[in-house]
Amino acid sequence: MRILLSNDDGIHAPGIQTLAKALREFADVQVVAPDRNRSGASNSLTLESSLRTFTFDNGDIAVQMGTPTDCVYLGVNALMRPRPDIVVSGINAGPNLGDDVIYSGTVAAAMEGRHLGFPALAVSLNGYQHYDTAAAVTCALLRGLSREPLRTGRILNVNVPDLPLAQIKGIRVTRCGSRHPADKVIPQEDPRGNTLYWIGPPGDKYDAGPDTDFAAVDEGYVSVTPLHVDLTAHSAHDVVSDWLDSVGVGTQW
């Protein structure tokens, strides 16, 4: 199995380093990751400037000022030959649950892999300690995929409780929960009297029902949520069409 491995925490982050070491025990792994933390970069792509890379002695490649999406795009189309069999993103330091997936560079890297036609996995740890647990779960999933490919055309967003492996209760297939909208902005003043702004923490959980990713991780289970790239709200087509007719917009042209 040939794996393109990326993340959004940066190439030196403990999550990606722990996972790369574990994956190399049974797979051919090429790391292509940002040279610094790009958390929250979502699906952003660098278009107004060139991208430089640096290759370490072990073959890992850092993309200078690159986003997670840049890294996967370059990895698939230029840096990994032959091309990968699968794109893996993580292990993220902290969860990507519910609405987090909208902003997550970890999920975005996997989404870019899927957009380019490859199976893709995004892996996050609900904490900052037991990266070895998340690595073991990821390896088990990838070994399963090598035995029997999952033909859903979906991204798997995996969130792992920050627990020793022996304390993991199992795996649940979940849906994304949701949070209350975040609204906290933290102003600060710099030495010259200018106001600086920090974006505050995410909102509290709003929908954390028993079938959500929030509930699974809180209860000690690995959450596996299938995600897809198509953002079309197919069920709303008729509603929107009827609305356009009712307000007279749909008949103007």
Swiss-Prot record:
Cofactor-binding details, from the entry: Binds 1 divalent metal cation per subunit.
One Gene Ontology CC term in the entry: cytoplasm
Protein family membership: Belongs to the SurE nucleotidase family.
Primary residence: cytoplasm
Top-level taxonomy: Bacteria, Pseudomonadati, Pseudomonadota, Gammaproteobacteria, Enterobacterales
Species this chain originates from: Salmonella arizonae (strain ATCC BAA-731 / CDC346-86 / RSK2980)
Recorded superkingdom: Bacteria
Subcellular locations according to the entry: Cytoplasm
Known EC number: 3.1.3.5, 3.1.3.6, 3.6.1.11
Gene assigned in the entry: surE
Pfam families hit by this protein: SurE
Protein name in UniProt: 5'/3'-nucleotidase SurE
